[in-house]
Amino acid sequence: LAVVDGEAARDCLRPTSRVAISPDDYEYDVDLCNALRRGLLRVERLSDLEVQTGVWRLRPDQPGVADLLLAGKGYPRQFVRWNEYAIPIPAAMHQAFQGEPGVEVSQDGRWLSVFAPLPDSLDDIVGVLELCVSLRGELPPVL
């Protein structure tokens, strides 16, 4: 996790956009967003697998819901669907928001996601890093 910046994850979304109706309403700090994205892309390149990365945040306006803050080169496929970026928090992701890594395999056995807590410099959990890999050798789409 040393390559993914917790401060950038915490602060890249501007305060006015932290409660939003849809991802189209987000306003990002471009420099922090780019720093976070570089970290996600670095994790993807370091892996020997075709891994997809993303950072999830808790929705302050919707308890029990998380949304995808930023993805690497492709959306993590297990939980993100077209136009569905805010999702009910799966058990493994909830575990990561509590400070412990979690693992979840999709019901159809196609995807494996590993969730890791993403702390800032004060060790506050500011998000969750997801690493998602296909268990059937399917290639992720490139954004």
Q: Residues of each region from the PLM?
A:
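Extracellular/periplasmic ligand-binding regions of membrane signal-transduction receptors
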Residues: 1-33
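Extracytoplasmic/periplasmic sensor domains and loops in membrane signaling proteins
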Residues: 33, 37, 69-107
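Extracytoplasmic/secreted envelope proteins and their assembly/folding machinery
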Residues: 37-41, 115
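Short N-terminal helix-loop-first-beta-strand/juxtamembrane motif that initiates sensory/input modules
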Residues: 41-65
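Envelope-exposed proteins and targeting segments
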Residues: 49-51, 109, 127
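A short beta-strand signature within small-molecule sensing/ligand-binding domains used
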Residues: 108-117
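Short hydrophobic/glycine-rich mini-motifs in sensory/regulatory modules
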Residues: 119-129
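Helix-start (N-cap) segments at beta->loop->alpha junctions
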Residues: 131-143
